[in-house]
């Protein structure tokens, strides 16, 4: 017969408590995340394709880029393998925000280059359609989900969207605009918070020529040496409106430099629409000076709402929405609405619409 001392019994009781606590933690973790089927290679690099029982043709993405509806779903909580993570950065296999991202190959593009078909599958056109005059295309927009486009708030009013448009009057798909949702802070008399969501009546039919673009969510300016791309159908140096999609390369003008430039410019030539100067919600970029002319590569009226974009990890990311400037091709940087500053509003608005 084994007789335990008081000390031994107390130690045994403590060990039982420890084991119970460990079992409780295991049960909590299991009930929260479920049995995760580990992929063959758990250290998949960001941007690579991945598959899970719930996600076919997904992509390893920063969790903040995932579709919010998916992140809060049972499928995510129970069966989403981690592609890559550390204490500060988590990458999972999911449908990127919003739905999925493309894997890529009235402002006008001054001194731009004609785009090849399907080069910018996220780019859409916005316009007004009437029985008398047909369609008058007035702005550009960016596909961010199967039902939403992102554009400039000053593009309103519009009632039709063209998708997969290679030439001025030829689009693979046309979709009726259900609602035009300007950012609540936007005022028509000013050039601030110039961003809007366009909700379409029907889901977009995705194909190689029609795909969404990922939002660039960092609020830090990209390096001045990195090439950025603008695109649109606006007027060129030789046409009031380009019959074909054009694109051009520009580079970042750092925020402080841009603020100083416009402060001097607005002091000499006051503009009530820019009475606050350049704000942090704006992104500044400028193209090179064109040889033999006194103009810079730039966007002008007709391209409004189009993209300022960068390519990273084989994906195109939307940095800004073409908004305004101080004359086409001028020496002043072009002004773009910084998408990262409105990322929360975009997510909330799209998610709220889905829930209705």
UniProtKB/Swiss-Prot annotation:
It is an enzyme of class 3 (hydrolase). One of its GO terms (biological process) is defense response to symbiont. Gene3D superfamilies: Trypsin-like serine proteases. Disulfide bonds join 50-93, 60-83, 66-94, 139-155, 258-284, 300-328. Its main location: secreted. SUPFAM superfamilies: Trypsin-like serine proteases (SSF50494). Glycans are attached at residues 62, 292. The active site is at 154 (charge relay system), 194 (charge relay system), 304 (charge relay system). Residues 49-94 form the Clip domain. The record marks 108-109 as: Cleavage. Transmembrane segments: none annotated. InterPro entries: CLIP_Serine_Protease, Peptidase_S1_PA, Peptidase_S1_PA_chymotrypsin, Peptidase_S1A, Trypsin_dom, TRYPSIN_HIS, TRYPSIN_SER. It is found in: Secreted. Probable serine protease which plays an essential role in the innate immune response against bacteria and protozoa infection by activating the melanization cascade. In the susceptible strain G3, appears to be dispensable for ookinete elimination which occurs by lysis. In the active form, heterodimer of a p12 subunit and a p30 subunit; disulfide-linked. This is CLIP domain-containing serine protease C9. The gene is CLIPC9.
């Amino acid at each position: 017969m084994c007789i335990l001392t008081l000390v031994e019994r107390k130690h045994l009781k403590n060990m039982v408590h420890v084991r119970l606590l460990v079992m409780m933690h295991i049960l909590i973790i299991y009930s929260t995340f479920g049995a995760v089927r580990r992929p063959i290679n758990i250290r998949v690099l960001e941007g690579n394709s991945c598959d899970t029982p719930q996600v076919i043709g997904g992509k390893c993405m920063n969790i903040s880029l995932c579709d919010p509806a998916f992140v809060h779903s049972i499928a995510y909580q129970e069966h989403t393998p981690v592609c890559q993570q550390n204490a500060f950065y988590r990458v999972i296999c999911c449908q990127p925000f919003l739905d999925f991202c493309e894997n890529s190959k009235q402002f006008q593009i001054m001194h731009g280059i004609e785009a090849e078909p399907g080069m910018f599958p996220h780019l859409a056109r916005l316009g007004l359609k009437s029985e008398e005059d047909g369609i008058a295309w007035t702005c550009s927009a960016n596909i961010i989900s199967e039902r939403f486009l992102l554009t400039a708030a000053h593009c309103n009013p519009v009632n039709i969207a063209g998708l997969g448009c290679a030439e001025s009057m030829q689009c693979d798909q046309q979709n009726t605009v259900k609602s035009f949702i300007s950012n609540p802070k936007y005022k028509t008399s000013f050039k601030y918070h110039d961003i809007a969501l366009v909700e379409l009546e029907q889901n977009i039919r995705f194909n190689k020529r029609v795909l969404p673009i990922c939002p660039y969510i960092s609020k830090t300016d990209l390096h001045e040496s990195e090439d950025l791309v603008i695109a649109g159908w606006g007027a060129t140096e030789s046409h009031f409106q380009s019959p074909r999609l054009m694109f051009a390369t520009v580079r970042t003008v750092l925020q402080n430099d841009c603020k100083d430039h416009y402060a001097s410019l607005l002091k000499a030539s006051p503009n009530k629409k820019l009475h606050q100067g350049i704000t942090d919600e704006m992104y500044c970029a400028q193209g090179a000076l064109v040889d033999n002319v006194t103009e810079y590569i730039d966007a002008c009226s007709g391209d409004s709402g189009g993209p300022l974009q960068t390519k990273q990890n084989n994906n195109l990311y939307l940095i800004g929405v073409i908004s305004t400037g101080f004359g086409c091709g001028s020496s002043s940087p072009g002004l773009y609405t910084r998408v990262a500053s409105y990322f929360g509003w975009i997510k909330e608005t799209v998610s709220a619409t889905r829930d209705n």
